[in-house]
């Protein structure tokens, strides 16, 4: 029978000092036999996805205390990728994932907490907390802040839905008037919550649901809706039950590594492919799998991508649907239901509620459930009122979207595409693979060949795109922007957005060893591995080289002979200490980022730290 970890600091005469300090936090004698549960919050006023979380930790804590636990809250950092985008701030985004994971480990282990409730929401916060949860392997429940309502505005006598990416594109489009650009900017992000499309934050919150570590509805129920409060209340109660099951009944099924098993990781990736999620989820799932000591690799993702269809299409791949529409159609469970009926899921998995997949679908799939309360929850909709307050409205759709032929979520028979929303490509400069979000690629350019225009920084590429130096048919290559080379593996949302602004979104490709925002669409291929800074062949590409992209056949090829590539590699190695570094880039890199770069692996390993360099 495992002993409460917290007993280390609450029991025994030699822990009198620790108990004295616990008493100073408000604990009493009666508390010293109870489980201490960390409420891991990420409130910050910097990030719209987190600005409403200040009081939600207290909400969870009250339920923990009422159920017989002791709640202790702390905060992690949270970087807003959208605000950090397009300047040096983006160098810090991905490294912040490791800092978040480490800080959770530090706090929980230093104070011997028994379990956690993780209150996350945005791009690197959910993955960082997920990595920490699987590393620590103590009972955990995730409950995120929820998606933002979609922006809406009237243009050309039509009400259209908007999001952050629209503001970026229109702001850079010389054909758009100042007044229209201003109108879109003011309308794009109307409420608190994670950006309204199937971008990285919402993708990851959907995946925690598929992994079984959060409750049904977590990935899609709006931040502003009153129904979301129940998820927080339930999380506080349920974590005490899970904690007691493990420590008092020796039930290891309550542990995250037994919930988020390899079968669950496969289900999560299947969901990701079916819903056309962000390519960043590949990075984060690979990283989380390593923390869980699960053998889940790019090869597994490649196999799944070849058999899973696209059953859901959401912004940025279409402006018709946002997360509020996914929720109306049944949310994550609605997509999982269609995948299950198609025979594409592992059914022998459980979630934090203790339900198997068939039980979860029976109770929460809008196509199966007889529970009116569940149907009512999935009718929770937007209010269209600007606010930064959680749970501030209770508007509902008149009906559910259960049209599996033409609605937001489709059945296998009516799939948007028999090919899934993500694909892994391999070739002679991506020997370990690269990732493309096929959900956002126009059918006309699934096969594409063009001459390379090579840039060694995102900034130079943006300048060239806006300066008219990139033309139809070009393949823009941005290298030395990987985890080590950037360092920090910047997102390339501005280059892809500006290609659209310049009318090149369907006639150009962009390839990088960096990554893309979840808001990216178009022929945008990232995570090229090995990266240039690690000696990857992307560092050998020269202006004018032809590059052939073949998504249907999962290929990407630099049309240069092996002999020529060998000669280029020899010349590169002859640069000595300067080999595999940018030739014409000046970038100030802090000590903190250099420390990150010294241990970073390429994207095919999840951009995690290389444990072999630490002797582990």
UniProtKB/Swiss-Prot annotation:
Binds 1 [2Fe-2S] cluster per subunit. This cluster acts as a Lewis acid cofactor. The active site is at residue 517. GO terms for cellular component: cytosol. It catalyses: (2R)-2,3-dihydroxy-3-methylbutanoate = 3-methyl-2-oxobutanoate + H2O; (2R,3R)-2,3-dihydroxy-3-methylpentanoate = (S)-3-methyl-2-oxopentanoate + H2O. Gene3D superfamilies: IlvD/EDD C-terminal domain-like. SUPFAM superfamilies: IlvD/EDD N-terminal domain-like, LeuD/IlvD-like. The keyword Amino-acid biosynthesis applies. Keywords: 2Fe-2S, Amino-acid biosynthesis, Branched-chain amino acid biosynthesis, Iron, Iron-sulfur, Lyase, Magnesium, Metal-binding. GO terms for molecular function: 2 iron, 2 sulfur cluster binding; dihydroxy-acid dehydratase activity; magnesium ion binding. [2Fe-2S] cluster binds at residues 122, 195. The modification N6-carboxylysine is found at residue 124. Pfam families: ILV_EDD_C (PF24877), ILVD_EDD_N (PF00920). Its cofactor is [2Fe-2S] cluster; Mg(2+). It comes from the Bacteria. Its EC number is 4.2.1.9. One of its GO terms (biological process) is L-valine biosynthetic process. It is an enzyme of class 4 (lyase). Pathway: Amino-acid biosynthesis; L-isoleucine biosynthesis; L-isoleucine from 2-oxobutanoate: step 3/4; Amino-acid biosynthesis; L-valine biosynthesis; L-valine from pyruvate: step 3/4. Functions in the biosynthesis of branched-chain amino acids. Catalyzes the dehydration of (2R,3R)-2,3-dihydroxy-3-methylpentanoate (2,3-dihydroxy-3-methylvalerate) into 2-oxo-3-methylpentanoate (2-oxo-3-methylvalerate) and of (2R)-2,3-dihydroxy-3-methylbutanoate (2,3-dihydroxyisovalerate) into 2-oxo-3-methylbutanoate (2-oxoisovalerate), the penultimate precursor to L-isoleucine and L-valine, respectively. Homodimer. Belongs to the IlvD/Edd family. NCBIfam families: ilvD, PRK12448.1. This is Dihydroxy-acid dehydratase.
């Amino acid at each position: 029978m495992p002993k409460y970890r917290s007993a280390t600091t609450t029991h025994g005469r030699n822990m009198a000092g620790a108990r004295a300090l616990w008493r100073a936090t408000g604990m009493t004698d009666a508390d010293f036999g109870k489980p201490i549960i960390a409420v891991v919050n990420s409130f910050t006023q910097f990030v719209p996805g987190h600005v409403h979380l200040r009081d939600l930790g207290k909400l969870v804590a009250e339920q923990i205390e009422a159920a017989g636990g002791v709640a202790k809250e702390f905060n992690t950092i949270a970087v807003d990728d959208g605000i950090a985008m397009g300047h040096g701030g983006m160098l810090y985004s991905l490294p912040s994932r490791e800092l978040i994971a480490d800080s959770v480990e530090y706090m929980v282990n230093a104070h011997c907490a028994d379990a956690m409730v993780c209150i996350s929401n945005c791009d690197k916060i959910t993955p960082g907390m997920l990595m920490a949860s699987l590393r620590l392997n103590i009972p955990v429940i995730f409950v995120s802040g929820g998606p933002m309502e979609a922006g809406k505005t009237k243009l050309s006598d039509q009400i259209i839905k908007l999001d952050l990416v629209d503001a970026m594109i229109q702001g850079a489009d010389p054909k758009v008037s100042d007044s229209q650009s201003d109108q879109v900017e003011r309308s794009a992000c109307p409420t608190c919550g994670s950006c309204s499309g199937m971008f990285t934050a919402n993708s990851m919150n959907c995946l925690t649901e598929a992994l079984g570590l959060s409750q049904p509805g977590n990935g899609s129920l709006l931040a502003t809706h009153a129904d979301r409060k129940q998820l927080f209340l339930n999380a506080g109660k349920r974590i005490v039950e899970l904690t007691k099951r493990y420590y008092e009944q020796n039930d290891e099924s309550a542990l995250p590594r037994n919930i988020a098993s390899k079968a669950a990781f496969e289900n999560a990736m299947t969901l990701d492919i079916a819903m056309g999620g962000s390519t960043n989820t590949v990075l984060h799932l690979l990283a989380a799998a390593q923390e869980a000591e699960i053998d889940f690799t790019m090869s597994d993702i490649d196999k799944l991508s070849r058999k899973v269809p696209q059953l859901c299409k959401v912004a940025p791949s279409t402006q018709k649907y946002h997360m509020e529409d996914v929720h109306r159609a049944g949310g994550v469970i609605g997509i999982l239901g269609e995948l299950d009926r198609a025979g594409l899921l592992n059914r022998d998995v459980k979630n934090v509620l203790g339900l198997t997949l068939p039980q979860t679908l029976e109770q929460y799939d809008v196509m199966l459930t007889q529970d009116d309360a569940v149907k009512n929850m999935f009718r929770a909709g937007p209010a269209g009122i600007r606010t930064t307050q959680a749970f501030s409205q209770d508007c509902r759709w008149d009906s559910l979207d259960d049209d599996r032929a033409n609605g937001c979520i489709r059945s296998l028979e009516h799939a948007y595409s028999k090919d899934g929303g993500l694909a892994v490509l391999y070739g002679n400069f991506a020997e370990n693979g690269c990732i493309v979000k096929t959900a956002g690629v126009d059918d006309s350019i699934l096969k594409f060949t063009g001459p390379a225009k090579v840039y060694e920084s995102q900034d130079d590429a943006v300048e060239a795109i806006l300066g008219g130096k990139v033309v139809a048919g070009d393949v823009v290559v941005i290298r030395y922007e990987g985890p080590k080379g950037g360092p920090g593996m910047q997102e390339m949302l501005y280059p892809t957005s500006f290609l659209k602004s310049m009318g090149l979104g369907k006639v150009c490709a962009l390839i990088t060893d960096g990554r893309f925002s979840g808001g990216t669409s178009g022929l945008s291929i990232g995570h090229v591995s090995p990266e240039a800074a690690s000696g990857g062949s992307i560092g050998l590409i020269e202006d004018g080289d032809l590059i052939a992209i073949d998504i249907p056949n999962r290929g990407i090829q630099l049309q240069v002979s092996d002999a020529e590539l060998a000669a280029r590699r020899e010349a590169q190695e002859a640069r000595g200490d300067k080999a595999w570094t940018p030739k014409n880039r000046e970038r100030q890199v802090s000590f903190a980022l250099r420390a990150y770069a010294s241990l970073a692996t390429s994207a095919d390993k999840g951009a995690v730290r290389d444990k072999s360099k630490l002797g582990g």
